[in-house]
Amino acid sequence: MYTDEVRTPQALKSRYFTNLGDLNCRTRRNSATGNSSVASAATPTNGGKQNTKCSPQMSTLVCTPPPKRFHKIRNPFEGALADRLHLPLIASPSLFRARTPQLSSTQFEWNIDEVSQLTPADVEPHETQFHDSPDPELESKAQMAISAFFKESLIVPSPVDCPLRKNRIILNADHTPISNKSSSGRRGRDCSVQTELTLPPILPKALEEALRPYLQPHLAGGTSGRFKSRSSGSDVFNSSMRRKLFDLHNVIVLGEKEAVQSPQMVGSSPQGKQTMFAGRLSDSASGEGSFGSLSPIRNLCGLPLGTPDDGNRSSKRKLLLINELEFPSPIAPPEHLSRRLVHSKVEASISSNEQHDTLSELTGTGRPACRFTPDRSSSPMQALEHSDSSINQRVSRLRVNSTRQLPSQSFLETVDQALFEEVEADDTDEPEADQESDEDEEEAEAMQLSTISFNCSSSNSDTPRGHRRHRSANRKNLSQSFSANLEEVEAQRVKTAPPVINPPAQRIGLYRVDSGFNETSIISTFACSQDISMACCSTPSTRP
């Protein structure tokens, strides 16, 4: 174990030189005894054995490195550092550690941030702190030096003093790709057009006849201008969707008529032409596996799916199409039909209406009833029983409504004329007596109307199945009484037809949307707009 003196550099140096001298003496002594011992001592294999014979101090000296040829350069201002290597270093980790003195008292003290918030100090800044006051003479000298440098040195000139800024670049019109000599004073605008060829809407007759074979109205979706007035049968194929779904080569155009605007039939559709056509619509000539073969329009003439069209059944198609067009569509109003078909089936519809009283349900004014909704009941059996029949009844009633419009028109005119003459005669003879009698009649009619509405509303309420017979009997008696009165009035109208003095008011078509179909009814005046059947539908049920 070495002491502190051995650790000093001077002690190590003196010890090194003494050991080196002793080593040289021993080597000389060993060389005199024999060369073999020196060689064995120099080999690395037996160098350890030779060292074991020496003292432990000798072993430590052998491990020391040899001295260097050049001395290490040291800092002359730190000559005393070599003597202080055995002492603690100056740059110790705890030398610059901040030491906080212990608190002299344990009382509460405010922090500096809290003190600044509680009692802030008013610090008034000096006036010269914000504005700068340079020396004008010094600033002028500096500016002169800066300007002299930028003027004398070879640098890019400033854009402000550039002479090109004053001269405007004016291009000649001849240098442009589009010359404006022809259109001087006009301003043009670029726009995209569909084709380079532009035709006016009204063409000369010769050009129109030359372009007629190339006209394809079914691709354009419609025609306009003179083409629309001169083209024959082009309105049939004006639907692009029909052109995509079906093949219209087998369609036979039966006729085309202009719809006559009359006060009896006021339609909501803007369609002005009535076109009748028959045929088989399909995608291809064979029709197998196509969309047209699956469509019910293909079987319009009653032919099987695989039967080809030979063109010999045009008469049969025409008859079937007329029969199909007689029935109005539940979606489109019946005004789309031609007046010829309506007049041809008036008598047949009246006879069928008399046979089926329960389907017509005519009111006291001779107009068809508007209540087409089925009876509402809480029983699911009744709903399943009358679901199919209710739809058939709606379609049948729609047929009656569409065919009974013309007779009801003349019938209402006759009734209004008769009532008008009776009222004038009664007013001239006995005004006071008739006023009392009219009040009594109004009270009686109101009581009868309330009774009818009560019975009809009770039929629509949630009642047991046992009351259905009584309700159906009352409804049948009511419809029979109305139909009997209708027959008597019609017989009188056939015998004597009084002249029309006052023209009838314009009819307004009403459409019901609660039953799922657009149902129509004709109203003579505003006073007759409240129908008994509609009042029955809106009256709540009070029967227990």
Curated annotation (Swiss-Prot):
Compartments, record wording: Cytoplasm; Nucleus
Pfam family, one: BORA_N
InterPro entries for the chain: Aurora_borealis_protein (IPR023252)
Region (Disordered): 28-55, 348-391, 422-480
Processing after translation: Phosphorylated by aur.
GO molecular function ontology, one term from the record: protein kinase binding
Gene Ontology cellular component list: cytoplasm; nucleus
Residue ranges, compositional bias (Low complexity): 450-461
Keyword Cell cycle applies: yes
Primary location: cytoplasm
Keyword Cell division carried by entry: yes
Gene Ontology terms describing biological process: activation of protein kinase activity; cell division; regulation of mitotic nuclear division; regulation of mitotic spindle organization
Domain of life: Eukaryota
Comp. bias intervals (Acidic residues): 422-445
Polar residues: compositionally biased ranges: 30-55
Spans traversing the lipid bilayer: none
Keyword terms: Cell cycle, Cell division, Cytoplasm, Mitosis, Nucleus, Phosphoprotein
Family recorded in the similarity comment: Belongs to the BORA family.
Summary of subunit composition and partner proteins: Interacts with aur.
Biological function: Required for the activation of Aurora-A (aur) at the onset of mitosis.
UniProt protein name: Protein aurora borealis
Originating species: Drosophila pseudoobscura pseudoobscura
Organism ancestry: Eukaryota, Metazoa, Ecdysozoa, Arthropoda, Hexapoda
Gene: bora
